[in-house]
Design a protein with these regions (language model features):
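Catalytic-core regions of core metabolic enzymes
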Residues: 3-474
């Protein structure tokens, strides 16, 4: 007999779902959008249908009991009337209709569903949500939601009802992000896209009536396309947090967690949002730290941590070397490093002399080389390369932060690639700060194309180092 656990909404739930096959949900070849409107062109279901039809390599069918035509395509009166079975059903109807539709999906041999609709446990409809979960579990039918945005897999599927022109989406990459909140997921996806961090998968699980974080963690741990697994978590059912931490500890990939509900006010907000039990945050946070699971304190940390760990998986001690053309930026970086438990070893006179000997004549007499290394605004590509070579060889350092201000007149757009190759040759992790403006794009891409994460802020760069230090050994 399987154990049960009791969430804050008072419903009994099995502590573990069976081993779901998520392939049809995340890489469907055929999709049905149930609940399209023949009256409102911008109805959420219509947006989803049209976007999938125009942008993704799947066959998509529109379903509405009234039939008709939508965007020049036939509208079918029911899931059972489609010309062939579908892998994924996207359900966007009023809550009271979802149970019957779910039954029809099961009878029609649909592979799984994402239930976009709200109006369940988050507004007190506990009974209806439990009926959905019981029916699906009885038939081995996986669904995401309800009360969610659903699934985004670059190049495969996008069930978000947000038009493509209103939201920047990440390109394909190594990071998977699972979020209880659709809004948080959208916000983070935009930030990831802006920083050039690619996604393998984004999932909004909403009320997580059936498929939960633990199920997706197990799937993503085995997914060859995913290198880093991140979660935004509002709460767990009783006992579920313990199981999640144990699974995350055993996961062979970096796991990053951003948890809300840290305060009593936050716990109330969580309960009204997705009907989750926030639990004791201090206990959960301590468990993450004990087992080497990276915790992000805020959204900036989540993005920074994912960016760093998608490039560097092995943990470090946190001994940082800093190279920059501006003493002020170096001082700011040192302060931030100190606040986050990172050390900045100082170079002795002998070490400084060796570095100085390799600098250009215009920089030799004015550079400060104690760590941070301040090459001044007169530095050339060669000066940065020489300094990076010395730091990359140093056994006293295990990571380098480059703070680049591209207005320095003597540096070129090739510097990012050249510095990346120096550090790669010595197997030394490199993190870069470059302001994210279009005129610096070639410089930034020189880093990114060579597997070096780039932050648009000094704090973000330091947080990337913090993530590598806090990661559990692979």
């Amino acid at each position: 007999m399987q154990d049960t656990c009791v969430p804050s909404n008072g419903l009994l739930m099995k502590s573990r779902s069976p081993g779901w096959d998520f392939k049809q949900l995340f890489q469907p070849k055929t999709v049905a959008v149930i609940g399209v409107s023949l009256k409102r062109e911008r109805h959420p279901a219509n947006v989803i249908f049209n976007k999938i039809h125009l942008r993704y390599p799947v066959d998509v069918f529109a379903v509405n009991p009234g039939g008709g035509e939508l965007f020049g395509r036939k509208v079918y009166t029911g899931i059972k009337n489609l010309p062939r079975p579908v892998d994924l059903a996207i359900i966007a109807v009023r809550a009271e209709y979802t149970l019957d539709i779910l039954k029809d999906c099961i009878d029609a041999g649909v592979g799984g569903a994402t239930i976009i609709s709200g109006g369940f446990a988050e507004v007190g409809r506990l009974d209806l949500q439990q009926q959905l979960a019981d029916l699906a579990r009885q038939h081995g039918f996986p669904f995401i939601g309800p009360n969610c945005l659903g699934i985004y897999v670059p190049g495969h599927i996008d069930t978000f009802f947000i038009p493509s022109e209103r939201m920047i989406r990440p390109e394909s990459g190594k990071v998977a992000l699972v979020s209880q909140s659709g809004g948080v997921l959208v916000d983070q996806m935009t930030k990831f896209a802006e920083q050039g961090i690619g996604f393998s998968l984004g999932v909004s699980i909403g009320n997580k009536a059936l498929v939960r974080e633990l199920d997706l963690l197990e799937y993503l741990a085995a997914d060859p396309g995913t290198g880093v697994i991140a979660f935004y978590i509002e709460g767990f059912a009783r006992g579920e947090g313990r199981d999640f931490v144990q699974a995350a500890r055993q996961c062979p990939k970096p796991v990053i967690v951003l948890k809300s509900g840290k305060t009593s006010e936050g716990m109330r907000a969580v309960s009204s949002h997705t009907a989750s039990m926030a639990g004791d945050y201090a206990v959960f946070s301590a468990a993450l730290a004990q087992h080497g699971i990276v915790e992000a304190i805020n959204e900036l940390e989540l993005v920074s941590f994912c960016g760093a760990l998608s490039c560097y998986g092995e943990p470090i001690e946190g001994r940082v070397g800093i190279i920059n053309p501006s003493g002020g930026h170096g001082a700011l970086a040192v302060d931030i490093c100190s606040r986050h438990g990172l050390s900045i070893p100082a170079f002795n006179q002998e070490q400084q002399s060796k570095i100085r000997a390799d600098l250009s004549s215009s920089v030799q007499s004015i550079a400060s080389l104690t760590n941070p290394i301040d090459l001044t605004g007169s530095a050339t590509d060669g000066d940065f390369m020489a300094a990076a070579e010395h730091l990359a060889r140093s056994p006293e350092l295990d990571v380098i932060i480059i703070l680049l201000l591209p207005y320095t007149p003597e540096i070129t757009s090739d510097l990012g690639a050249r510095l990346s190759l120096v550090c790669r040759r010595h197997n030394k992790p490199l993190i870069a700060y470059v302001p994210h403006v279009e005129r610096y794009r070639m410089l930034i891409e020189g880093f990114e194309f060579n597997g070096v994460p780039v932050s648009p802020s000094i704090k973000g760069a330091v947080l990337m180092v913090k993530a590598i230090k806090g990661n559990k050994p692979c």
